[in-house]
Swiss-Prot record:
This is Oxygen-dependent coproporphyrinogen-III oxidase. Its cofactor is a divalent metal cation. Pathway: Porphyrin-containing compound metabolism; protoporphyrin-IX biosynthesis; protoporphyrinogen-IX from coproporphyrinogen-III (O2 route): step 1/1. A divalent metal cation binds at residues 102, 112, 151, 181. Belongs to the aerobic coproporphyrinogen-III oxidase family. It comes from Vibrio parahaemolyticus serotype O3:K6 (strain RIMD 2210633).
Amino acid sequence: MSAIDKYAVKQFLMSLQDSICQQLEQEDGKAVFVEDAWHREPGERLGGGGRSRVLRDGLVFEQGGVNFSHVEGKEMPASATAHRPELAGRRFEAMGVSLVIHPKNPYVPTSHANVRFFIAEKEGEEPIWWFGGGFDLTPFYPFEEDCQSWHDTAKAICAPFGEDVYAEHKAWCDKYFFLPHRNETRGVGGLFFDDLNHWEFDKCFDYIKAVGEGYCQAYLPIVSRRKDIEYGEREREFQLYRRGRYVEFNLVYDRGTLFGLQSGGRTESILMSMPPLARWEYRYEPEAGTPEAELYERYLKPREW
């Protein structure tokens, strides 16, 4: 069994945050990420700290957040131990990079990515550890070409790790990013995985490296293709309406958000994924035969790519 090196994981995550921020700034051409470094004082429920980076009012990106955090605690919150009683009584560390990018142009999809590592330790016992993460795409005016290239990149990332990895993690993504009260997916999916520890540590670590580094490879070509398409008030209004679904999912269903808030995490960083503007409209129905209707009919349900 390969040795568990949580320090190497932390170094990778911090360098990944740097790399993603640099690539997004280059694509935007104007805005830069502003860093808010934070740490927890001794005696708080959670120790540790992180680097929250936010970009606002760019040429391409209306708002984006790329967050690194490394927190530790003496015991798990009840929300976690209810599902995993073996974690009770163990000190834990959780570290990861999480990001959400909200573009200006409605023809450029919103995107999200996350890679994370968790370890719970108790003296005299083997550590309990796992990796999680993935990336997913939320278009407002989808292009078949973009959705296909997004999933083709995901397939290429997964291929070296096993012939079933893409299919499993793609299906998991479709299931996870689903809004039951709306009976629709949040977007066109991608990859999602959690509790990844059935391979050797080194192989699991290599996989999250590939996913983390693959995010920009998948997303930035789509941004480049769509960022200069002309749009008007109608497209902007629909973009804001669909952003409301993002808010609904994150506040009602997202496990990371719920875990962070319940465990005493840093609220500003946890809610960094929220769009700067969103809107709701009572009983909205897209007009038949419109691009807005096509989103509902063809893209907000699981499909094979």
